[in-house]
A protein has these predicted regions:
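Substrate-binding rim/cap in mid-to-C-terminal beta-strand-loop elements of soluble/periplasmic
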Residues: 136-158
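N-terminal anchoring/stem segment of glycosyltransferases
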Residues: 1-69
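GT-A fold catalytic core of metal-dependent nucleotide-sugar glycosyltransferases
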Residues: 81-129, 133-139
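Short, charged, amphipathic alpha-helices and their helix-cap/turn boundaries
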Residues: 58-72, 106-111, 115, 153-156
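Catalytic core and acceptor-binding pocket of nucleotide-sugar-dependent glycosyltransferases
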Residues: 153-173
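Short, solvent-exposed loop/turn segments at secondary-structure junctions
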Residues: 31-34, 61-64, 103-106, 130-132, ...
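Conserved interaction-surface patches within small, structured recognition/assembly domains
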Residues: 68-82
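Structural recognition of the beta-strand scaffold that forms the well-ordered cores
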Residues: 57, 124-126, 146
């Protein structure tokens, strides 16, 4: 099911359809040692289905090429919390598609770019129907997120994450 959040007036819909496009970039992050064979096969799967996309699998060193220095609060954070911050910051700055490393594709990702161009959405994502109690506010999964650069929604999420989640830690939030 497709959701458009908020009550958009016609002039807002026009602006949305002029939104910047999601670039054909797939982002992922792997912390620590080399990825195990299963994860390496997932990365190969992405390249096989999407030869025209830039597939960027980052580690603790290469992530700095795209984001510069990371917040001090991430130095001792869990790999999960670190990846959560990195995914939002990459999408906020550069746009693209975030996939968790263990994601196996069954088709090319062109549909994501096409869907965003049709809808003008700030974010393409899956939601958890099981936990969504109000259809106006679905619980969005973060293993797959796609956004244009400077997405207002992603910027808001990243601001909340940086200024609330990081100081409290994942469990405290």
């Amino acid at each position: 099911q497709e959701y458009l959040f908020g009550s958009r007036r016609p002039d807002e819909r026009d602006r949305a359809h002029n939104a910047r496009a999601i670039p054909p970039i797939v982002w992922a992050y792997w912390s620590g040692a080399a990825a195990p064979p299963l994860i390496a096969r997932c990365f190969a799967n992405w390249r096989q289905f999407n030869p025209h996309f830039s597939i960027r699998v980052l580690d603790d060193d290469s992530v700095r090429n795209y984001l510069g220095e990371l917040p001090e609060a991430l130095e001792h954070a869990s790999a999960t919390l670190r990846a959560d911050w990195i995914r939002l910051e990459l999408l906020r700055r550069h746009g693209g598609i975030w996939l968790d490393a263990s994601t196996l594709l069954t088709a090319p990702l062109d549909w994501v770019l096409q869907q965003q161009q049709r809808s003008g959405s700030d974010l393409i994502a899956y939601y958890l129907d099981r936990y969504t109690t109000d259809a106006q506010f679905p619980i969005v999964e973060n293993w797959f997120l796609a956004a244009p650069p400077q997405s207002a929604l992603v910027a808001d999420l990243q601001h909340e994450f940086t200024h609330t989640v990081l100081p409290l830690g994942g469990a405290g939030y």
